[in-house]
From Swiss-Prot:
The keyword Mitochondrion does not apply. PROSITE patterns: DEGV (PS51482). Transmembrane segments: none annotated. Hexadecanoate binds at residues 62, 94. It holds the Pfam family DegV. It comes from the Bacteria. One of its GO terms (molecular function) is lipid binding. Coiled coil: none annotated. The keyword tRNA-binding does not apply. This is DegV domain-containing protein lin1977. May bind long-chain fatty acids, such as palmitate, and may play a role in lipid transport or fatty acid metabolism. Keywords: Lipid-binding.
Amino acid sequence: MRKIKIITDSTAGLTLEEAAKWNIEVLYLTVEIDGKVYNPKTDITPEEFMVRMAETKELPKSSQPAIGSFVEAYEKYTAEGYEILSIHLTEKLSGTVNAARQAADMVEGNITVVDCDYTARGQAFQVLKAAEMAQAGDYSVEEIHAAINDIRDKTKLYIVVVTLDNLIKGGRVGRMQGFLGSLLNIKLIAKLTDGQLEEETKVRSNKKVLQYCLNLIKDEPKKIQQLDVVHANGLNLADDFIAESKEITGLTEIPLFFADPVISTHAGTGAFAFMYYTD
């Protein structure tokens, strides 16, 4: 039986139960609010983070795990006889995967580092598939890598930003453009493509957001195998989207998750995202 350890980072949004069930090692990105650093695993819940973020004038800062954290994890599991498959969010959004690559070069053993091209549950799709195959003990790292690449190629991720405040604070939207967008009640819908967030469209009401997003589901030519929803205090949109998506897709379960603080930092209050993969 092969011993393969799956390692990922916290932006995948795995629950503690998922990580425990599938024996996945999660390395945490941290967030800094008003000079204080928080580890989302031990120091602050996603809900508490949203409250703190609303209270601060400055955009919280996120930091990738230190290279030393990767080295420590890689040394631990290679010493126990594991091969390692380390799956991380797109390098277009964070330097996490590059830190993992540097650490892998410093540790002897069979360590494969993967840029999954996604984040949030789009990343989790690949991580959970890898962990399921690793736990079976019948597959090589190469076979698992090929399987998650297949899921990657069949995945789509969309995010709805209902307030431009955090994008303005982060310098991603000009202040005048953001001010006008707020006046016009503009909601931004973006798509993650090849690891890069790109504008899909802009609409002017939550009703039009819901209509547009549901049309994306309706117009998907292939059968949707898994559809997950993530929100940052965006339950109104998320709940309506889930209810109607069940009717469209025939899926009986569409899981809903609270966004990881790193994701919420950039998406802002009220955001929600949905991601799926097809057959």
